[in-house]
Regions:
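Basic Lys/Arg-rich amphipathic helical interaction modules
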Residues: 1-36, 56-70
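Short Lys/Arg-enriched helix C-cap and helix-to-coil transition segments
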Residues: 46-52
Length: 70
């Protein structure tokens, strides 16, 4: 599956700014794993108050980097 197909099939249904729960569902991992990735900088994010938000563009960058490694 190429990068464009990932975007069209997986991430197209999600909003441009995603919650931890939405990010978790998109990646197929637990929210605990997403929190770890956000805290250690694996996925770029922004904090709104006490909540993390993940711009879809940052999630796409993460996926692109990891697809290149695979």
């Amino acid at each position: 599956m190429n990068f464009k197909e990932v975007y069209q099939t997986v991430l197209n249904a999600y909003p441009e700014i995603m919650s931890v729960e939405e990010t978790s569902a998109a990646l197929g991992v637990s929210t605990k794993t997403v929190y770890k990735m956000l805290k250690n900088g694996t996925i770029q994010n922004m904090k709104v108050g006490r909540s993390y938000r993940v711009p879809k563009v940052h999630l796409l960058s993460f996926l692109k980097i990891n697809m290149a490694k695979a």
